[in-house]
Amino acid sequence: MPRPLSKSRNIRKIMLQMISRRHGIVGSPHFQPLPQATVESATAPQVDIAQESAAVSRRPVMAGPGTGLISQPDLLTLQRAPFAVRVLSHLTAGATAASIAEFNALGADDSARLTAFVDQQLNPGAIDDSALETRFAAGGYTTLNKSLTQLWADHRIITTDSSAPARETQRAALIRAVFSRRQLQEVMVDFWQNHFNVAIANGNAAPVYVHYNRDVIRANVFGNFRTMLEAVGQSTAMLYYLNNSSNSRSGPNENYARELLELHTFGAENYLGFVNPFQVPPAPEDPAYPIGYTDLDVYDTASAFTGWTVKDGRNGPSTENDGTFVYRQPMHDAGPKLVLGMYLNPEQPALKDGRDIYDRLASHPRVAKFICKKIIRRFVSDRPDPSLIDSAAAVFRANWQNPDQLRITLRHILLSNAFIHGWGQKNRRPFELIAAAMRACGSDWNIKAV
């Protein structure tokens, strides 16, 4: 098992020498000094959102020609929508007359109805959604049920219609948003697919996009974040999109490693730059972890994932060409690595370098905060209450090895007072606006696959 770095001066000296040999920079003036704000931010007082919002509301509204503003601020105050409408506007693609009636029948009061609805939606397997399959069949959808190897054979090896899986996934997303009874699942599929973004127009990813949406994102949407991290990292679509399929000892590529740390786990807010890893302070939430990540973490993370590639007839035997994940030992950099204060021994077993890093990330307190803050911003407010972020992150981290981690964390957020009392703090994106309008109209329609 990887071990946290000892504070022994000898160990630190050895590790500095190792980094120096690998990167040629330790001990030189090229390291950036760690910003003092990095240390101070951990203990900085949080802004009182309620006080700040009240202060903003007291500011006068300036009106005048061409400003687009009115001189009577009271006219901007909107009446709060009924509780059912508020909940359904956040947790589904939009409220309908039928969904409002169904929600109101779930309990004797708002609290009981919300709890029942959230628990129902967090168990999508118990909700009959078979009518969607009828719509897809009527629309001529032919790729949505193909396996990864079928997609590869039909749309990658045979390239006459290589974009069909991506096109059908995209069109099916709108059909599901409008007509699915598993509404919260569809909202979270959209959330995680944006989080672990793969461009639908990417020529290498398009032929297998159905697999990415169905078997990687959708299959893990209420499951475990650590499990989803590895599923994404081993997915054919992501391996191509972020170039890890060609990441090797002789030709390293840090694209996936950098996005893994910056977008998928820590967020740019926890990026420390090009600094000496031994100068990084511990995270105040748990001193066994560093407060953020550095460029050297990116470099050694890239090395850890060398050899993670695709059976595409190029990086191995030409007969191995079915589009599935494969680990190529000759491509792997088996040397020692230092990532997030964790020393990885040289010559570890196959896949272990990468899996150790996934474990380190999934259990990191700053990763928990980043992920929970992003979920809260999706459902509650773009300026969430820090106390909700902290409590959700505690739940997320306490359950990091629980197969239902994401379900448990999401339930905590959706039953919070911040969610219950929130309203009017979010705007819909264009896709969400179209889906909500179509649901409100209640018309029956379909989108053809071609």
What are the residue ranges of the model-derived segments?
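Short, flexible active-site-proximal loops enriched in glycine and acidic residues
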Residues: 184-188, 200-208, 251
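Structured, charged N-terminal subsegments at the starts of enzyme catalytic cores
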Residues: 157-161, 166-186, 190
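N-terminal intrinsically disordered, low-complexity leader regions
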Residues: 27-50
